[in-house]
Regions:
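Active-site machinery of serine-nucleophile hydrolases
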Residues: 69, 76-117
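A domain-start/cap signature at the N-terminus of enzymes
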Residues: 2-5, 9, 13, 34-69, ...
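Hydrophobic h-region of N-terminal signal peptides that target proteins for export
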Residues: 27-35
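Short beta-strand/loop motif that positions the catalytic acidic residue
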Residues: 189-191, 195
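Gly/Ser-rich "nucleophile elbow"/oxyanion-hole loop immediately N-terminal to the catalytic nucleophile
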Residues: 64-65, 112-144
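C-terminal catalytic histidine-bearing segment of alpha/beta-hydrolase fold enzymes
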Residues: 196-251
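The conserved beta1-alpha1 loop
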Residues: 73-74, 191
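Primarily recognizes the serine-hydrolase "nucleophile elbow" in alpha/beta-hydrolase
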Residues: 137-181
Length: 251
């Protein structure tokens, strides 16, 4: 029978050294747990953000009184830095149908982005302060991506606009969730019944949410139009007659 195993002095000393080495780390962990705290607070600070946006403003000359302003938001195909193309498919094309002097403002969305509605809001405010604009007669319209921007901006700042018209506009759940923001707006929706780019369901679903809180809201479907329902919308003089007949103070 072999002798019982005995630890040498070296092994005992080595084991004690290991314990001594790891002991500070054990205390460190306990100390860390003891000093941890949960902080609940609120961040509240004014943050300045630079906004930059190109635009075209068609401003009648030699007008003595303040004039109405139509703001037009283009679709995704007109993004970039060629300002001339923002006038495509827009009220600019049908200015001859508008029976009174109006200013038309068309900002341009940068390439590869969607509308920054906060930037558009501050642009409209600046234009309405800088020029002779009737602030009770500011109208907002847009097509496709610009229709989405129109509904988004109108929901964020309904107090700014006398009337709103969105054409072949994508809609989203954030708009549906905040549908009460649209309850006092004069608003018309237009869509092509054969639209295979932005499906008509976008208009139907939004209108179903909108109409119960805003019975005066209207939806027009052009049954034979595809995504180009802007042609049928902006070529109709009645759109401009409807817009210009409305004022914020007399909604």
């Amino acid at each position: 029978m072999g002798k019982p195993f005995r630890k040498t002095k070296f092994e005992k000393r080595n084991k004690m050294n290991l314990k001594q080495k790891f002991l500070p780390f054990l205390f460190l962990g306990i100390t860390s747990l003891a000093t941890a705290q949960e902080i609940k607070s609120e961040f509240n600070k004014e943050v300045k953000v630079q906004k930059k946006m190109s635009y075209i403003l068609d401003m009648p000359q030699n007008t003595k009184s303040k004039i109405p302003l139509i703001v037009f938001l283009h679709g995704s195909g007109e993004r970039g830095n060629d300002l001339e193309i923002v006038k495509n498919h827009s009220p600019f094309t049908y200015k001859n149908l508008i029976k009174e002097p109006v200013a038309i403002l068309a900002p341009q969305c940068p390439a590869n982005t969607w509308w920054d509605t906060e930037a558009v809001y501050f642009l409209i405010k600046e234009i309405s302060e800088k020029y002779k604009i009737d602030k009770d007669r500011i109208y907002l319209t847009g097509l496709s991506m610009g229709g989405w921007g129109t509904l988004k901006l109108a929901g964020e700042h309904p107090e700014m606009f006398a009337a709103v018209s969105a054409v072949c506009a994508p809609t989203d759940r954030a708009m549906w969730a905040n549908i009460h923001n649209y309850k006092d707006l004069n608003i018309k929706l237009f869509h092509g019944g054969m639209d295979d780019i932005v499906l008509p369901e976008n208009a139907f679903n939004f209108y179903q949410k909108l109409h119960p809180v805003n019975p005066k809201a209207e939806l027009t479907i052009f049954p034979n139009d595809n995504h180009n329902s802007w042609d049928s919308t902006y070529s109709d003089p009645k759109l401009y007659e409807w817009m210009l007949s409305l004022k914020k103070s007399k909604n």
